[in-house]
């Protein structure tokens, strides 16, 4: 049986940790002038993928 392929787009966006998969928050790429400093500061923090999405991410990262 051939090796399973890792989804490269998913590999670049998510990192496996002991508690699940770490991800970056959205809404911090452009149109930042109208967003408050507080909002942008909170968006800089990493967060975990929702529990319901973990199986799909894990399937795309077979060696994570």
UniProtKB/Swiss-Prot annotation:
Protein name: Large ribosomal subunit protein bL35
HAMAP family in UniProt: Ribosomal_bL35 (MF_00514)
NCBIfam families linked: rpmI_bact
One GO cellular component term noted in the UniProt record for this chain: cytosolic large ribosomal subunit
Alphabetical UniProt keywords: Ribonucleoprotein, Ribosomal protein
Family to which this protein belongs: Belongs to the bacterial ribosomal protein bL35 family.
Keyword Oxidoreductase applies: no
Gene: rpmI
InterPro entries documented for this protein: Ribosomal_bL35, Ribosomal_bL35-like, Ribosomal_bL35_CS, Ribosomal_bL35_sf
GO biological process entries: translation
Organism of derivation: Shewanella oneidensis (strain ATCC 700550 / JCM 31522 / CIP 106686 / LMG 19005 / NCIMB 14063 / MR-1)
Single Gene Ontology MF annotation: structural constituent of ribosome
């Amino acid at each position: 049986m051939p090796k399973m392929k890792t989804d490269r787009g998913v590999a670049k966006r998510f990192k496996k940790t002991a508690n699940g998969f770490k991800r970056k928050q959205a809404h911090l790429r452009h149109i930042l002038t109208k967003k408050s400093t507080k909002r942008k500061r909170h968006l800089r923090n990493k967060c975990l993928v929702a529990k319901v999405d973990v199986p799909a991410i894990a399937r795309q990262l077979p060696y994570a």
